[in-house]
Amino acid sequence: QSAIKYIRDTFQKEFGKEMNLERISAPLFVEKSSGLNDNLNGVERPVQFDIAGIKDEAVEVVQSLAKWKRMALKEYGFQPGEGLYTNMNAIRRDEELDNLHSCYVDQWDWERVITKEERNEETLKDTVRAIFKVIKHMEHEVWYKYPQAVKILPDQVTFITSQELEDRYPGKTPKERENLITKEYRSEEH
């Protein structure tokens, strides 16, 4: 638990600095009529309840912050190149439970303002490289403090499209293709 807290706290600080993001608190619930709750796939039912001080209005536990983050960027006056990061706590009552999924969600999230001209593949790749730079730095910090918790990452990120993966491994499932390409580029647990 202490390693998880260390990674989370340090990553948020380093990532926020690298990406020019400010920490903003996210709501636990929103008024149903606000339209800010994301219905995900359209079939998940949000947890809903009433609050004594809010007459004739139900509130819903947030399921996703997608709409809220964009509203917050505008409301707080963020400019291109600036953004926010936040933490979402949610209950997803229709989640299919397994080793990776729970009905309780504790999710870290971020959003940044970009210009129309920046909506392109190169901006996406530059953003991924910046994120990877922080992750690589974190790998070293974590190794120094918790050597047993580290996975060895490659020195640089590799980009490949779904089509390129399918062409390279035509008889494999998408998950098998992912596993094969990560082994090839050494992004695996050691």
Where do the model's predicted regions map?
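Class II aminoacyl-tRNA synthetase-like tRNA-binding/catalytic domains
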Residues: 1-101, 109-113
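Long, highly charged amphipathic alpha-helices
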Residues: 6, 10, 126-137
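Intrinsic disorder/low-complexity segments enriched in polar/small residues
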Residues: 32, 189-190
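Short, flexible, solvent-exposed loop/turn segments with mixed acidic/basic and small polar residues
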Residues: 98-103, 178-180
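Well-ordered alpha/beta subsegment
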Residues: 115-117, 121-125
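Metal-assisted phosphate- and nucleotidyl-transfer catalytic regions
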Residues: 130-189
